[in-house]
Amino acid sequence: MIRAAALLLAAGLAAPALAGDASGFDPASIDQCLAAAPTQGARADCAGIGMEACLAYAKGKYSGDDPDFPMANCLDASHQAWEAKLTATYDAALTAEGTKPQEMLRRAERSWLQFREDLCNQARAAAPEGQGELAAARCLRDETARQTALLLALEPAE
């Protein structure tokens, strides 16, 4: 059942399982947490922000028989929000005035993408039976949040 939920999420078909909004995840919670975080480490700790509200919402709306579906749904929504934040941060770093090592940043980001994929595949493989998809989803979310925090730390001070 977990694999079915993960496949639905990957195919973008999770929305019909929940009434209304697919997740209840509020991407603004990420911006609020990042704005309040004074250090790179504190920003990376924002990875799980918004999950409690999302889970409460998803559990109230989901009527299926897979107990892991609300968690998978919220992890996916959280990861997608972090991915959007990372992309915006990366694009800003590439276009920042005075940013000369753009090719180095591009290479680093490509290497990081491969690292994240391999790390999260390892998390999937190492997880207890039936928990691999959730472990991989959590890994994707957490690593994307960490990378966002790292790129934010590289921004020049205003």
Kindly give the residue locations of the regions a language model identified.
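Sequence termini and other peripheral, non-core segments
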Residues: L8-G12
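N-terminal signal peptide c-region/cleavage motif recognized by signal peptidases
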Residues: A14-P16
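N-terminal alpha-helical modules
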Residues: A19-E158
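Bacterial N-terminal signal peptides that target proteins for export
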Residues: M1-L7
